[in-house]
C-alpha cells in the first residue's frame, strides 16, 4: 500500500468500486453480445428452413401480376360490358384474391406432405364431383359460352383449377403405390388412363380443353418421371396426338382456331378467329425493347379481349417491353428449376411421393406458363389458359398458392431430414 492510499483510504475504496462496476459492465456486455449473436444465428437457422429465393420469385410474380392486372383492367369500365363497375373493381377483387390465396397458402404450408399423400384419392374424387356439379343447371355459372364456375360469394370457383392440384397429388400417390406395375399396361397405365379420360370428358363438356391438356401433361408427366415403360409412354404420346388431331378435325371451332393460328393476318381470320392473336402480336411489337411504360398500352383500350386474364402477357410485353418479358420468363424458369431440384432432393431422401409431387408442380406451372406465353406470342393455337400467379382470377391464384405452399413444405421437410431431424 502506497502513501497516498494510507492517507486517503476512501480513494482505494472508490477505485475498487469502479473496477467491480467496470468488470461487471464488460461481463454484461459480453453476455448481451453472445445472446445477440445467438439470436442472429437462430434467426438465420429459421430462415434457412425454406428456400428464400423461391419465395421471393413467387411474391415477385404475384406483385407484378397485381400491377399489370390493374393496368390492363383500368379502362374496362369505359366499355359497355363493365359499365356498371368502377375502374378499380378488378384491382380490388384481385387484391382480395391475393390476400385469400396467401392466407390459405400459409395454412397449407403447415400440412405435412404425408397428409396430402393419404387423402389424395379423396381430394381427387371430390374434385370430380365438383366438375360434375359445374354442368348441373342452376349450379354452374356460364361465361362466354363456357360453364366452368361455381359461385361462392367472394369468388367464382373454377373446379378445373382444383383438378390441376388434385392431379399432381393423385398421380404422385398412384405412381408410388403402383411402382411395381408401371411396366404393365393393364395394371399400370390403364387405371390412370381411365381416370384422365373421365376428367377429360368432364372438362371437354364445359368446354375447357386447355385445362384438360394441362391435367393430362401433369398426370402422364409424373408417370414418366416415376419410371413408366418407355414403349407404353411412346404409345401414349401417339394416342394423345391422334386424339388431339381428331378433336380439331371434327370441331368447327377448333378447326377455325387452328387455321387462324396458321395465318392470323389473312383478312377473314384477322377480323374473327385470329383477332386476339393479331392484336397480341401488335402489342408485343409496340413494346420493343423497354416498353411504352406502365399504363401506356394501346391494345388494352378495348382492342385486345381478355387483356387482364389470358392475354396479360401481351400487355406486359407492350408496357414493359422485351426486358420485362425476359424478367417474367426468368422468374418462371427459377420456380420450375427449384421445384425440380426440390423433387430430386426428396427422391434422394427416399421420399417418393414428395419428390414426384414437387416435380408435378414444376410440370404444372412450367407447361401452363409455356402454353400461355406461346399463345400470346403466336407460337401455339389460342387456348383459354391464364398465366400462373399473374393473371386475374381467384381460383387460379388460390390453387397456385396452395401448390407453392406444398412445394415449400416439401423443401422444409427435406432440410429437416438433411440436418438429421425427424418428421
Swiss-Prot record:
GO cellular component: cell division site; plasma membrane
Cytoplasmic side: 1-53, 110-119, 171-184, 230-231, 332-359, 408-423
Highest taxon above the source species: Bacteria
Signal peptide coordinates: none
Catalysis performed (reactions): [GlcNAc-(1->4)-Mur2Ac(oyl-L-Ala-gamma-D-Glu-L-Lys-D-Ala-D-Ala)](n)-di-trans,octa-cis-undecaprenyl diphosphate + beta-D-GlcNAc-(1->4)-Mur2Ac(oyl-L-Ala-gamma-D-Glu-L-Lys-D-Ala-D-Ala)-di-trans,octa-cis-undecaprenyl diphosphate = [GlcNAc-(1->4)-Mur2Ac(oyl-L-Ala-gamma-D-Glu-L-Lys-D-Ala-D-Ala)](n+1)-di-trans,octa-cis-undecaprenyl diphosphate + di-trans,octa-cis-undecaprenyl diphosphate + H(+)
EC number: 2.4.99.28
Pathway terms, separated by semicolons: Cell wall biogenesis; peptidoglycan biosynthesis
UniProt subcellular location: Cell inner membrane
Membrane side Periplasmic: residue ranges: 75-88, 141-149, 206-208, 253-310, 381-386
Keyword hit for Hydrolase: no
Record-level GO BP terms: cell wall organization; FtsZ-dependent cytokinesis; peptidoglycan biosynthetic process; regulation of cell shape
One MF annotation (Gene Ontology) recorded for this entry: peptidoglycan glycosyltransferase activity
Keyword Cell wall biogenesis/degradation applies: yes
The entry's keywords: Cell cycle, Cell division, Cell inner membrane, Cell membrane, Cell shape, Cell wall biogenesis/degradation, Glycosyltransferase, Membrane, Peptidoglycan synthesis, Transferase, Transmembrane, Transmembrane helix
TM annotation in the entry: 54-74, 89-109, 120-140, 150-170, 185-205, 209-229, 232-252, 311-331, 360-380, 387-407
Its biological purpose: Peptidoglycan polymerase that is essential for cell division.
Family designation: Belongs to the SEDS family. FtsW subfamily.
Record protein name field: Probable peptidoglycan glycosyltransferase FtsW
Amino acid at each position: 500500500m502506497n502513501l497516498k492510499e494510507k492517507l486517503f483510504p476512501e480513494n482505494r475504496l472508490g477505485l475498487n468500486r469502479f473496477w467491480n462496476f467496470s468488470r461487471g459492465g464488460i461481463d454484461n456486455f459480453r453476455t448481451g453480445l453472445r445472446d445477440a449473436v445467438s439470436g442472429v444465428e437462430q434467426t438465420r437457422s429459421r430462415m434457412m428452413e425454406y428456400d428464400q429465393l423461391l419465395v421471393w420469385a413467387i411474391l415477385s410474380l404475384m406483385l407484378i401480376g397485381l400491377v399489370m392486372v390493374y393496368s390492363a383492367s383500368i379502362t374496362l369500365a369505359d366499355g359497355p360490358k363493365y359499365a356498371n363497375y368502377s375502374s378499380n373493381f378488378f384491382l380490388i377483387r384481385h387484391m382480395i384474391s391475393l390476400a385469400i390465396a396467401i392466407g390459405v397458402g400459409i395454412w397449407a404450408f403447415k400440412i405435412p406432405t404425408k397428409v396430402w399423400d393419404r387423402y389424395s384419392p379423396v381430394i381427387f374424387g371430390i374434385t370430380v364431383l365438383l366438375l360434375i356439379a359445374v354442368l348441373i343447371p342452376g349450379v354452374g355459372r356460364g361465361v362466354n359460352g363456357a360453364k366452368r364456375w361455381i359461385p361462392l360469394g367472394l369468388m367464382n370457383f373454377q373446379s378445373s383449377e382444383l383438378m390441376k392440384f388434385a392431379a399432381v397429388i393423385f398421380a404422385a400417390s398412384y405412381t408410388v403405390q403402383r411402382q411395381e406395375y408401371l411396366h404393365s399396361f393393364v395394371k399400370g397405365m390403364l387405371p390412370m388412363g381411365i381416370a384422365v379420360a373421365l376428367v377429360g370428358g368432364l372438362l371437354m363438356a364445359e368446354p375447357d380443353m386447355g385445362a384438360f391438356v394441362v391435367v393430362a401433361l401433369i398426370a402422364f408427366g409424373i408417370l414418366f418421371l416415376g419410371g413408366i415403360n418407355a414403349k407404353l409412354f411412346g404409345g401414349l404420346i401417339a394416342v394423345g396426338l391422334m386424339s388431339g388431331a381428331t378433336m380439331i378435325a371434327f370441331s368447327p371451332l377448333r378447326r377455325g382456331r387452328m387455321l387462324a393460328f396458321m395465318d392470323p393476318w389473312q383478312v377473314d381470320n384477322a377480323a374473327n378467329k385470329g383477332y386476339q392473336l393479331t392484336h397480341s402480336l401488335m402489342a408485343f411489337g409496340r413494346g420493343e425493347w423497354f416498353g411504352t411504360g406502365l399504363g401506356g398500352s394501346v391494345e388494352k383500350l378495348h382492342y385486345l379481349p381478355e387483356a387482364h386474364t389470358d392475354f396479360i402477357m401481351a400487355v406486359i410485353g407492350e408496357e414493359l417491353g422485351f426486358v420485362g418479358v425476359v424478367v417474367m420468363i426468368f422468374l418462371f424458369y427459377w420456380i420450375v428449376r427449384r421445384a425440380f431440384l426440390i423433387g430430386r432432393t426428396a427422391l434422394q431422401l427416399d421420399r417418393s411421393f414428395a419428390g414426384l409431387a414437387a416435380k408435378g408442380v414444376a410440370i404444372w406451372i412450367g407447361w401452363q406458363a409455356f402454353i400461355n406465353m406461346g399463345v400470346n406470342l403466336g407460337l401455339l393455337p389460342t387456348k383459354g389458359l391464364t398465366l400462373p400467379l399473374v393473371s386475374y382470377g381467384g381460383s387460379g391464384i388460390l390453387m397456385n398458392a396452395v401448390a407453392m405452399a406444398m412445394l415449400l413444405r416439401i423443401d422444409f421437410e427435406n432440410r429437416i431430414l438433411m440436418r438429421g431431424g425427424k418428421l
